[in-house]
Amino acid sequence: MKRLLLLTAIFLTGCIDAEIELNTKSPERTPTETVSLYVDSFNSADVTALNEITASPFFWLRGEDKNVYDKYGDSVDFQALQNNGWSYSKINSLELIYEDSETSMVHMNFSRYGADDQVILTASANYLLMNYYNNWKIKGGF
């Protein structure tokens, strides 16, 4: 009887549907924290940091323009921005639109300021982020 009970228990154990969590480590930063760090690196014109925060290839979709770059640093021209009066950018709002374990979407409203601290542009952008080895990276913007 004990043998039958033991065999039944072993058999039933194999029938239990168990979910195994293979990726138990959470990303170091949230998607919104990643976008905030992106803006900090942008304000420092730190192309190396920007390339680390973003994924390659990187894309921009702006209106009818669709651009894909080997890396984010290829998409930005800080000298041209400065020639147009840009000094720094400031986040007005960040909103997490969507998040699952692999992807997320963040909406950012921001302003660009000149050296005189006057707003020269206010705009919005949506960013697609991908979870690469427990690090959120910005894959593209639109």
What are these regions (language model features)?
Residues T54, E64-D65, M108-R112, F142:
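A mature extracytoplasmic/lumenal domain signature
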Residues Y38, A49-N51, F58, D74, ...:
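Hydrophobic pocket/interface hotspot
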Residues C15-T48, E52, W60:
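Short, low-complexity N-terminal intrinsically disordered segments enriched in polar/charged residues
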Residues I20, I120-F142:
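Short beta-strand edge/turn micro-motifs at domain boundaries
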Residues S75-Q118:
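Surface-exposed, charged secondary-structure patches
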Residues F58-Y69, N84:
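A short gly/proline-enriched turn/hairpin at secondary-structure junctions
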Residues L4-L12:
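Sec-dependent N-terminal signal peptides
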